[in-house]
Regions:
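Non-catalytic, mostly N-terminal accessory regions of nucleic-acid modification and defense proteins
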Residues: 1-186
Length: 186
């Protein structure tokens, strides 16, 4: 166990950051009757949403502390100036996690993706929006949202270490293995 924890901390040299295996096991368990080619979009979309929500929330807290100096935490330009996507209230991770146990969680995630694309033109047409489909078990989707919610992805420290890129790389290799393909063949 100590050796495993030690290996997980070696994140500055490109090694695993420590939580990918946990996420992968959850994703694999939660995927239910979907194959890896379909489920990768579900998982990677949620990871991206958590990443931008974390970055947004960190900047939001900074702006709240600077209100007396004229900062406006509800002005999207305050975020864009720092290369952070604006995340509308209904699309913030906290709102999704608060509804993770609801049978409508799939629709709420779809609506969050639509809202993010609406307010961030650079993301228009890019985000997955099929979380409400019947084949996706909503209870398991909620469990995955809760699990991803325990991991900090988009704060400044993790952004500087390219955590998102490393998590995506890890997941793509795992999805490729699950499909019996080599990485890059998606």
């Amino acid at each position: 166990m100590a050796r495993k924890a030690k290996a997980a901390k070696k994140s500055d040299n490109g090694a695993k950051v420590g939580f990918e295996d946990t996420l992968w096991l959850a994703a694999d368990k939660l995927r239910n009757n979907l194959d890896a080619a379909e489920y990768k979009h579900v998982v990677l979309g949620l990871i991206f949403l958590k990443y931008i929500s974390d970055a947004f929330e960190e900047r939001h807290q900074e702006l709240l502390a600077e209100v007396e100096q004229g900062a406006d935490p509800e002005d999207p330009d305050e975020y864009l100036a720092e290369n952070i996507f604006w995340v509308p209230p209904e699309a913030r991770w906290s709102a999704l996690q608060a509804n993770a146990k609801q049978p409508t969680i799939g629709k709420k995630v779809d609506d969050a993706m639509v809202a993010i694309e609406r307010d961030n033109k650079r993301l228009k047409g890019v985000l997955p929006k099929d979380y409400g489909r019947p084949a996706l078990d909503k209870q398991r989707l909620g469990e995955l949202i809760d699990l991803i919610g325990t991991i900090g992805l988009g704060d400044k420290e993790n952004r500087s270490k390219d955590i998102l890129g490393r998590v995506y790389e890890y997941f793509l290799s795992q999805f490729a293995s699950a499909e019996g393909k080599k990485g890059g063949q998606f």
